C-alpha cells in the first residue's frame, strides 16, 4: 500500500531545496525552506495590515484587531497585567505554528511541522524561554519551584520536577508532530479513495484541526510561563 501512495510535487523539489550541502554534508532542508516561507507570509501580511491601518478599520484590519486583542486579553486573564510584555512572543509562536501547519494544505507546499526537527527547535525554545523568564524574575529563588511544599520532600521533588520539566519539550514535540503528520497521511488516503467528495469536508476539518494544534501549543507555552512566574511557596 505504501508503495502505491503517490508522491506530491513540492515547490522545494522544483527549486532543489529539499536537500542542501552544508560543510560538505548533504542535509535535509525541506522543513527549513517551508519555515522560511511561513515567516515570509507573516512578514508580508504584517506589512499589508500595517500600511492599511485606518481609524475606521476595514475587514482585514478588523479581523487582526479582534484576533490579537482576544489573545492578549486571554493572556492577561491567565498571567495578569505582567503578561502583556510576554504577549508578543506568545502570539508570535501561535501565528508561526498556525501558518506552518496550514502550509500542508496548500498545493506544492509541505507543513514544516510535519518534520520532527522543526518541532524540536520550537519546543526547546519554549523550554529555555519560560525558564529564563522564571530565573530572571526570581533569581536563585526560582529553585523553590522545584522543591515542593515540604523541605523534607525537597530532594525527591527536585528529581521529579526536573524530570517533569525535561519531559515538556518531548511532549510538545511529539504532540505537534504526531497530529500534523497523521492528518497529512489521512488526508492523502481520503483523496485516493474519493478524490473530490471525500476530500473537501475532511480538508476543512483538518484546517480547523491544524489551527487547534497551534492554539494548544500556545496554551501549553502560556501555562509553563505562568508556572515559572508564579511565586513558589
Curated annotation (Swiss-Prot):
Superkingdom of the source species: Bacteria
Family per similarity comment: Belongs to the ATPase A chain family.
Signal peptide: none
Protein name as catalogued: ATP synthase subunit a
Alphabetized UniProt keyword annotations: ATP synthesis, Cell membrane, CF(0), Hydrogen ion transport, Ion transport, Membrane, Transmembrane, Transmembrane helix, Transport
Main subcellular location of this protein, as a coarse class: membrane
Its membrane topology: Multi-pass membrane protein
Keyword Transferase attached: no
Gene3D superfamilies named in the record: ATP synthase, F0 complex, subunit A
Subunit relationships: F-type ATPases have 2 components, CF(1) - the catalytic core - and CF(0) - the membrane proton channel. CF(1) has five subunits: alpha(3), beta(3), gamma(1), delta(1), epsilon(1). CF(0) has three main subunits: a(1), b(2) and c(9-12). The alpha and beta chains form an alternating ring which encloses part of the gamma chain. CF(1) is attached to CF(0) by a central stalk formed by the gamma and epsilon chains, while a peripheral stalk is formed by the delta and b chains.
InterPro entries documented for this protein: ATP_syn_F0_a_bact/chloroplast, ATP_synth_F0_asu, ATP_synth_F0_asu_AS, F0_ATP_A_sf
Protein's cellular compartments: Cell membrane
UniProt keyword Calcium, yes or no: no
Organism: Lawsonia intracellularis (strain PHE/MN1-00)
Cysteine-cysteine disulfides: none
Function: Key component of the proton channel; it plays a direct role in the translocation of protons across the membrane.
A GO BP entry: proton motive force-driven plasma membrane ATP synthesis
Gene of this entry: atpB
Transmembrane domains' residue ranges: 29-49, 86-106, 108-128, 140-160, 185-205, 206-226
GO MF term list: proton-transporting ATP synthase activity, rotational mechanism
GO cellular component: plasma membrane; proton-transporting ATP synthase complex
Amino acid at each position: 500500500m505504501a508503495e502505491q501512495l503517490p508522491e506530491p510535487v513540492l515547490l522545494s523539489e522544483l527549486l532543489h531545496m529539499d536537500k542542501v550541502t552544508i560543510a560538505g554534508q548533504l542535509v535535509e532542508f525541506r522543513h527549513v525552506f517551508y519555515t522560511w516561507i511561513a515567516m515570509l507570509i507573516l512578514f508580508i501580511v504584517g506589512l499589508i495590515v500595517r500600511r492599511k491601518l485606518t481609524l475606521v478599520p476595514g475587514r482585514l484590519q478588523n479581523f487582526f484587531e479582534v484576533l490579537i486583542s482576544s489573545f492578549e486579553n486571554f493572556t492577561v486573564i491567565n498571567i495578569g497585567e505582567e503578561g502583556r510584555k510576554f504577549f508578543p512572543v506568545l502570539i508570535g509562536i501561535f501565528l508561526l505554528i498556525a501558518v506552518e501547519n496550514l502550509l500542508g494544505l496548500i498545493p506544492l507546499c509541505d507543513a514544516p511541522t510535519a518534520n520532527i526537527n522543526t518541532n524540536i527547535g520550537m519546543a526547546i525554545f519554549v523550554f529555555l524561554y519560560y525558564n529564563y523568564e522564571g530565573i530572571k524574575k526570581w533569581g536563585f529563588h526560582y529553585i523553590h519551584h522545584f522543591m515542593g511544599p515540604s523541605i523534607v520532600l525537597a530532594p525527591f521533588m527536585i528529581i521529579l520536577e526536573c524530570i517533569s520539566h525535561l519531559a515538556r519539550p518531548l511532549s510538545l514535540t511529539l504532540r505537534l508532530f504526531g497530529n500534523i503528520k497523521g492528518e497529512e497521511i489521512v488526508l492523502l488516503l481520503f483523496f485516493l479513495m474519493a478524490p473530490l467528495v471525500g476530500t473537501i469536508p475532511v480538508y476543512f476539518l483538518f484546517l480547523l484541526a491544524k489551527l487547534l494544534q497551534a492554539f494548544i501549543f500556545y496554551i501549553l507555552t502560556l501555562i509553563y510561563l505562568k508556572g515559572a512566574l508564579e511565586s513558589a511557596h
